[in-house]
């Protein structure tokens, strides 16, 4: 069967694959469009396996919020910042985030095995593998989290075009623009200052005991002549200072250093006749904790050439 330019164009639009790849697929399958799509999928999977050894440490974080009540945050990684800014990649990440917000998956493995909402004949993993083939880089759906505000609101914040994403969950009996704007400011605080806990009540006794042990050793080394009662007071002061840095509500509010974040939230709540309590936050930063692989140039060229 003769392969026409129109057939190649149609297959390209269906799959996003390159022109020569589409022409080859149609030739190999005698012009059968469905078989050609399957041929490209199989070819894409082979390419994806070769690319899987490369480190995907760039990418973006995306958030999706439904009705101010349910939200999802996802991190999807690429190998390069160039691809992270690509519309094809960003559209895929948005589709992943939209699927997460509707998903009941308990973990990443379960999510990857779900039917892909855009084409239920595929799984999420299949969709990822196909996107790897189209984009030409190793991609990785690294993590996600879904949150719900049963008695309040969820507010998102994205910083740096997706480099950092934050969700803040709050219980509130008033939901208006002022309350949501204040919670967005809190989300910006989380992005900038990276707290570990909402409040001191969340800090475990094990963590406190561990920190006290470290601070005690430091204080004794720095002040060997001081009595135990003085050392104890020093430890308490240092621990309080540390807690003010790692607990969101105790942090100095970056937009007004006269207030803590907790006092800022209380101030806005009072102005709006509301009761507002921040109950949870989630912060994802692209690539955090991923060790980037460094190859010499010759090895990189050889790897990409399949040598």
Model-derived segments and their meaning:
Residues 2-307:
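N-terminal assembly/interaction segments in proteins that build large macromolecular machines
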């Amino acid at each position: 069967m003769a392969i026409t330019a129109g057939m190649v164009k149609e297959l390209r639009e269906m799959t996003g694959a390159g022109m020569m790849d589409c022409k080859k697929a149609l030739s190999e399958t005698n012009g059968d469009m469905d078989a050609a799509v399957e041929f490209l999928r199989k070819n894409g999977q082979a390419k994806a396996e070769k690319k899987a050894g490369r480190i995907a440490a760039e990418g973006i974080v995306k958030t999706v919020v439904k009705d101010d009540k349910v939200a999802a945050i996802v991190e999807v990684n690429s190998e390069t910042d160039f691809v992270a800014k690509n519309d094809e990649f960003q559209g895929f990440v948005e589709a992943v985030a939209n699927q997460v917000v509707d998903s009941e998956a308990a973990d990443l493995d379960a999510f990857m095995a779900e039917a892909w909402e855009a084409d239920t004949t595929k799984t999420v993993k299949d969709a990822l593998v196909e996107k790897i083939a189209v984009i030409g880089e190793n991609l990785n759906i690294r993590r996600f989290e879904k949150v719900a505000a049963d008695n309040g609101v969820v507010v998102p914040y994205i910083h740096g075009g997706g480099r950092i994403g934050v969700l803040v969950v709050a219980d509130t009996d008033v939901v208006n623009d002022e309350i949501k704007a204040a919670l967005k400011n809190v989300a910006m605080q989380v992005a900038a200052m990276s707290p570990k806990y909402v409040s001191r009540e969340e800090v475990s006794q094990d963590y406190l005991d561990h920190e006290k042990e470290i601070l005690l050793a430091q204080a004794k080394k720095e002040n060997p002549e001081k009595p135990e009662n003085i050392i104890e007071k020093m430890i308490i002061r240092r621990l309080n200072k540390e807690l003010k840095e790692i607990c969101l509500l105790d942090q100095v509010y970056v937009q007004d250093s006269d207030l803590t974040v907790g006092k800022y939230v209380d101030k806005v709540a009072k102005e709006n006749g509301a009761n507002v309590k921040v109950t949870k936050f989630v912060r994802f930063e692209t690539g955090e904790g991923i060790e980037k692989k460094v190859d010499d140039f010759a090895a990189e060229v050889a790897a990409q050439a399949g040598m």
